[in-house]
Amino acid sequence: MIPLTPLFSRYKDSYLLYAFRLIDLLRASKSAHLTRLLSLQATYLYHFACLIKYKDVQKYEVQQLIEWAASAPPDIDLQQFRVEFMDNTAELNLRSCQPKSFMYTFTTIWDTIHFLSLIIDDMVATREKSSLDFVAQQLKTMKVLFYNIFFILQCAMCRDHYMNVKGYIIYHIERIDVALEKERYGAPITFSESYCEETIENARQDTQDLEGPPTKRARLADTLEHADSTTAANVLMRNLMAYVSMTFHNHINDYKWIQRNQKPPLHQERMTWVRYKKALNL
Protein backbone atom coordinates (compact mmCIF):
# COMPACT_ATOMS: atom_id res chain seq x y z
CA MET A 1 0.00 0.00 0.00
CA ILE A 2 1.41 3.38 -1.03
CA PRO A 3 1.43 5.87 1.88
CA LEU A 4 -0.93 8.79 1.29
CA THR A 5 1.46 11.72 1.48
CA PRO A 6 0.88 15.24 0.10
CA LEU A 7 3.30 14.46 -2.74
CA PHE A 8 1.51 11.25 -3.70
CA SER A 9 -1.85 13.06 -3.55
CA ARG A 10 -0.45 15.59 -6.02
CA TYR A 11 0.71 12.74 -8.24
CA LYS A 12 -2.82 11.29 -8.27
CA ASP A 13 -4.36 14.62 -9.24
CA SER A 14 -1.83 15.03 -12.05
CA TYR A 15 -2.60 11.51 -13.24
CA LEU A 16 -6.28 12.41 -13.64
CA LEU A 17 -5.35 15.52 -15.62
CA TYR A 18 -3.00 13.46 -17.78
CA ALA A 19 -5.85 11.03 -18.52
CA PHE A 20 -8.10 13.95 -19.47
CA ARG A 21 -5.52 15.35 -21.88
CA LEU A 22 -5.07 11.91 -23.39
CA ILE A 23 -8.76 11.53 -24.25
CA ASP A 24 -8.65 15.05 -25.66
CA LEU A 25 -6.29 13.66 -28.31
CA LEU A 26 -8.97 11.20 -29.39
CA ARG A 27 -11.15 13.81 -31.10
CA ALA A 28 -8.23 15.07 -33.19
CA SER A 29 -7.10 11.63 -34.35
CA LYS A 30 -7.47 11.02 -38.08
CA SER A 31 -6.09 7.49 -37.99
CA ALA A 32 -8.21 4.49 -37.03
CA HIS A 33 -5.11 2.76 -35.66
CA LEU A 34 -4.12 5.76 -33.53
CA THR A 35 -7.69 6.15 -32.28
CA ARG A 36 -7.77 2.52 -31.20
CA LEU A 37 -4.37 2.83 -29.50
CA LEU A 38 -5.35 6.00 -27.63
CA SER A 39 -8.70 4.46 -26.67
CA LEU A 40 -7.02 1.40 -25.18
CA GLN A 41 -4.61 3.54 -23.19
CA ALA A 42 -7.32 5.90 -21.99
CA THR A 43 -9.49 2.95 -20.98
CA TYR A 44 -6.66 1.51 -18.91
CA LEU A 45 -5.96 4.88 -17.26
CA TYR A 46 -9.59 5.39 -16.30
CA HIS A 47 -10.06 1.81 -15.15
CA PHE A 48 -7.14 2.37 -12.83
CA ALA A 49 -8.52 5.73 -11.72
CA CYS A 50 -11.79 4.00 -10.82
CA LEU A 51 -9.92 1.40 -8.80
CA ILE A 52 -8.21 4.16 -6.84
CA LYS A 53 -11.33 6.26 -6.31
CA TYR A 54 -14.11 3.66 -6.12
CA LYS A 55 -12.25 0.40 -5.41
CA ASP A 56 -14.02 -0.97 -8.48
CA VAL A 57 -13.67 -0.77 -12.27
CA GLN A 58 -16.60 1.08 -13.83
CA LYS A 59 -16.23 -0.59 -17.22
CA TYR A 60 -19.49 0.54 -18.81
CA GLU A 61 -19.16 4.13 -17.62
CA VAL A 62 -15.54 4.36 -18.77
CA GLN A 63 -16.48 2.92 -22.16
CA GLN A 64 -19.20 5.56 -22.53
CA LEU A 65 -16.73 8.30 -21.61
CA ILE A 66 -14.17 7.11 -24.15
CA GLU A 67 -16.78 6.80 -26.90
CA TRP A 68 -17.99 10.33 -26.17
CA ALA A 69 -14.44 11.72 -26.37
CA ALA A 70 -13.73 9.91 -29.63
CA SER A 71 -16.89 11.31 -31.22
CA ALA A 72 -16.50 14.88 -29.92
CA PRO A 73 -16.14 17.51 -32.67
CA PRO A 74 -12.46 18.11 -33.45
CA ASP A 75 -13.02 21.83 -33.99
CA ILE A 76 -14.24 22.73 -30.49
CA ASP A 77 -11.67 24.35 -28.25
CA LEU A 78 -10.19 22.75 -25.16
CA GLN A 79 -12.31 24.88 -22.82
CA GLN A 80 -15.54 23.62 -24.40
CA PHE A 81 -14.26 20.05 -24.35
CA ARG A 82 -13.49 20.49 -20.66
CA VAL A 83 -17.04 21.72 -19.93
CA GLU A 84 -18.54 18.75 -21.76
CA PHE A 85 -16.13 16.39 -20.00
CA MET A 86 -17.30 17.65 -16.62
CA ASP A 87 -20.93 17.20 -17.67
CA ASN A 88 -20.34 13.68 -18.98
CA THR A 89 -18.35 12.47 -15.98
CA ALA A 90 -21.07 13.85 -13.67
CA GLU A 91 -23.78 12.10 -15.67
CA LEU A 92 -21.82 8.83 -15.63
CA ASN A 93 -21.14 9.08 -11.88
CA LEU A 94 -17.42 9.46 -12.54
CA ARG A 95 -17.02 12.75 -10.69
CA SER A 96 -14.06 11.41 -8.75
CA CYS A 97 -12.20 11.07 -12.06
CA GLN A 98 -12.36 14.83 -12.58
CA PRO A 99 -9.03 16.59 -12.01
CA LYS A 100 -8.96 19.16 -9.23
CA SER A 101 -7.05 21.48 -11.54
CA PHE A 102 -6.86 21.69 -15.32
CA MET A 103 -3.56 23.60 -15.27
CA TYR A 104 -1.51 21.38 -17.58
CA THR A 105 2.28 21.76 -17.39
CA PHE A 106 5.41 19.63 -17.63
CA THR A 107 4.90 18.91 -13.94
CA THR A 108 1.70 17.06 -14.89
CA ILE A 109 3.68 14.68 -17.07
CA TRP A 110 6.48 14.23 -14.56
CA ASP A 111 3.99 13.58 -11.77
CA THR A 112 2.30 10.95 -13.92
CA ILE A 113 5.62 9.24 -14.65
CA HIS A 114 6.38 9.14 -10.93
CA PHE A 115 2.84 7.97 -10.13
CA LEU A 116 2.96 5.06 -12.58
CA SER A 117 6.39 4.12 -11.27
CA LEU A 118 5.08 3.97 -7.71
CA ILE A 119 2.15 1.85 -8.86
CA ILE A 120 4.55 -0.64 -10.44
CA ASP A 121 6.54 -0.86 -7.22
CA ASP A 122 3.34 -1.42 -5.26
CA MET A 123 2.25 -4.19 -7.63
CA VAL A 124 5.56 -5.95 -7.11
CA ALA A 125 5.45 -5.52 -3.34
CA THR A 126 1.88 -6.89 -3.12
CA ARG A 127 2.17 -9.51 -5.87
CA GLU A 128 1.17 -12.31 -3.48
CA LYS A 129 -2.30 -10.75 -3.21
CA SER A 130 -2.88 -11.23 -6.94
CA SER A 131 -0.71 -13.43 -9.13
CA LEU A 132 2.53 -13.27 -11.06
CA ASP A 133 0.55 -13.52 -14.30
CA PHE A 134 -1.57 -10.52 -13.34
CA VAL A 135 1.47 -8.40 -12.44
CA ALA A 136 3.27 -9.45 -15.63
CA GLN A 137 0.27 -8.37 -17.71
CA GLN A 138 0.14 -5.01 -15.92
CA LEU A 139 3.84 -4.47 -16.57
CA LYS A 140 3.28 -5.16 -20.25
CA THR A 141 0.63 -2.45 -20.36
CA MET A 142 2.79 -0.06 -18.35
CA LYS A 143 5.60 -0.41 -20.88
CA VAL A 144 3.20 0.70 -23.60
CA LEU A 145 2.09 3.68 -21.52
CA PHE A 146 5.67 4.80 -20.93
CA TYR A 147 6.58 4.18 -24.56
CA ASN A 148 3.76 6.41 -25.79
CA ILE A 149 4.15 9.34 -23.42
CA PHE A 150 5.67 11.23 -26.36
CA PHE A 151 2.12 11.52 -27.78
CA ILE A 152 1.25 14.10 -25.16
CA LEU A 153 4.52 16.07 -25.16
CA GLN A 154 3.81 19.38 -26.86
CA CYS A 155 7.47 20.40 -27.13
CA ALA A 156 9.12 18.96 -30.26
CA MET A 157 12.61 18.98 -28.73
CA CYS A 158 11.31 17.27 -25.58
CA ARG A 159 9.43 14.71 -27.66
CA ASP A 160 12.50 13.81 -29.70
CA HIS A 161 14.65 13.53 -26.59
CA TYR A 162 12.11 11.32 -24.83
CA MET A 163 12.05 9.01 -27.84
CA ASN A 164 15.82 8.60 -27.44
CA VAL A 165 15.94 7.96 -23.69
CA LYS A 166 12.63 6.29 -22.77
CA GLY A 167 14.36 2.92 -23.01
CA TYR A 168 15.95 3.63 -19.61
CA ILE A 169 12.56 3.32 -17.93
CA ILE A 170 11.40 0.37 -20.01
CA TYR A 171 14.66 -1.50 -19.40
CA HIS A 172 14.07 -1.39 -15.66
CA ILE A 173 10.48 -2.59 -16.05
CA GLU A 174 11.90 -5.55 -17.95
CA ARG A 175 14.34 -6.18 -15.10
CA ILE A 176 11.27 -6.57 -12.91
CA ASP A 177 9.83 -8.92 -15.54
CA VAL A 178 12.96 -11.05 -15.30
CA ALA A 179 12.86 -11.08 -11.49
CA LEU A 180 9.22 -12.18 -11.50
CA GLU A 181 9.97 -14.91 -14.02
CA LYS A 182 12.82 -16.20 -11.86
CA GLU A 183 10.47 -16.26 -8.90
CA ARG A 184 7.93 -18.19 -10.94
CA TYR A 185 10.52 -20.94 -11.40
CA GLY A 186 11.61 -21.19 -7.80
CA ALA A 187 13.97 -18.28 -7.04
CA PRO A 188 12.12 -15.92 -4.66
CA ILE A 189 12.83 -12.22 -5.04
CA THR A 190 15.17 -10.81 -2.41
CA PHE A 191 14.82 -7.05 -2.01
CA SER A 192 17.85 -4.81 -1.69
CA GLU A 193 17.78 -1.30 -0.24
CA SER A 194 20.21 0.07 -2.81
CA TYR A 195 20.55 0.17 -6.58
CA CYS A 196 23.31 -1.93 -8.08
CA GLU A 197 23.88 -3.29 -11.55
CA GLU A 198 24.50 -6.97 -11.90
CA THR A 199 28.23 -7.60 -11.50
CA ILE A 200 28.40 -11.38 -11.42
CA GLU A 201 28.06 -11.83 -15.18
CA ASN A 202 30.68 -9.15 -15.74
CA ALA A 203 33.05 -11.06 -13.47
CA ARG A 204 32.36 -14.28 -15.35
CA GLN A 205 33.10 -12.57 -18.64
CA ASP A 206 36.31 -11.01 -17.31
CA THR A 207 37.66 -14.36 -16.11
CA GLN A 208 37.61 -15.46 -19.74
CA ASP A 209 39.98 -12.64 -20.69
CA LEU A 210 43.08 -14.70 -21.45
CA GLU A 211 45.15 -11.59 -22.12
CA GLY A 212 44.93 -10.50 -18.49
CA PRO A 213 47.74 -11.35 -16.05
CA PRO A 214 47.31 -14.49 -13.92
CA THR A 215 46.91 -12.43 -10.75
CA LYS A 216 44.02 -10.51 -12.29
CA ARG A 217 42.30 -13.72 -13.43
CA ALA A 218 42.73 -15.24 -9.97
CA ARG A 219 41.34 -12.13 -8.31
CA LEU A 220 38.31 -12.11 -10.60
CA ALA A 221 37.73 -15.80 -9.97
CA ASP A 222 37.78 -15.17 -6.22
CA THR A 223 35.31 -12.32 -6.69
CA LEU A 224 33.03 -14.55 -8.73
CA GLU A 225 33.18 -17.39 -6.21
CA HIS A 226 32.37 -15.00 -3.38
CA ALA A 227 29.51 -13.44 -5.33
CA ASP A 228 28.01 -16.81 -6.20
CA SER A 229 28.10 -17.92 -2.56
CA THR A 230 26.86 -14.72 -0.92
CA THR A 231 24.62 -12.98 -3.44
CA ALA A 232 20.96 -13.94 -3.64
CA ALA A 233 19.97 -15.50 -6.95
CA ASN A 234 17.17 -13.04 -7.59
CA VAL A 235 17.83 -9.56 -6.20
CA LEU A 236 15.67 -6.53 -6.92
CA MET A 237 15.90 -3.08 -5.44
CA ARG A 238 12.98 -2.18 -3.21
CA ASN A 239 11.00 0.69 -4.78
CA LEU A 240 13.11 0.29 -7.92
CA MET A 241 10.85 2.25 -10.26
CA ALA A 242 10.50 5.16 -7.84
CA TYR A 243 14.30 5.36 -7.83
CA VAL A 244 14.47 5.02 -11.61
CA SER A 245 11.90 7.75 -12.23
CA MET A 246 13.79 10.05 -9.84
CA THR A 247 17.15 9.51 -11.57
CA PHE A 248 15.48 9.85 -14.98
CA HIS A 249 13.97 13.18 -13.90
CA ASN A 250 17.35 14.38 -12.64
CA HIS A 251 18.99 13.44 -15.93
CA ILE A 252 16.43 15.26 -18.06
CA ASN A 253 16.84 18.37 -15.90
CA ASP A 254 20.62 18.16 -16.30
CA TYR A 255 20.53 17.56 -20.04
CA LYS A 256 18.13 20.38 -20.90
CA TRP A 257 20.97 22.90 -20.55
CA ILE A 258 22.87 21.08 -23.28
CA GLN A 259 19.76 21.14 -25.46
CA ARG A 260 19.42 24.88 -24.90
CA ASN A 261 23.15 25.46 -25.37
CA GLN A 262 23.22 27.27 -22.04
CA LYS A 263 25.47 27.13 -19.02
CA PRO A 264 23.71 25.32 -16.17
CA PRO A 265 23.03 27.30 -13.00
CA LEU A 266 25.63 27.01 -10.28
CA HIS A 267 23.22 25.72 -7.67
CA GLN A 268 20.84 23.58 -9.69
CA GLU A 269 18.83 21.47 -7.28
CA ARG A 270 18.69 17.72 -7.82
CA MET A 271 16.48 15.29 -5.97
CA THR A 272 18.26 12.77 -3.76
CA TRP A 273 17.01 9.31 -2.94
CA VAL A 274 17.00 10.02 0.80
CA ARG A 275 14.86 13.15 0.38
CA TYR A 276 12.56 11.52 -2.15
CA LYS A 277 11.89 8.50 0.04
CA LYS A 278 11.15 10.81 2.95
CA ALA A 279 8.70 12.88 0.87
CA LEU A 280 6.85 9.70 -0.13
CA ASN A 281 7.25 7.98 3.24
CA LEU A 282 8.74 4.91 1.56
From Swiss-Prot:
Pfam families, sorted: Baculo_p33 (PF05214)
Keyword entries, A-Z: Early protein
InterPro entries: Baculo_p33
Family to which the UniProt record says this protein belongs: Belongs to the baculoviridae p33 family.
Protein name, entry field: 33 kDa early protein
Protein's gene: P33
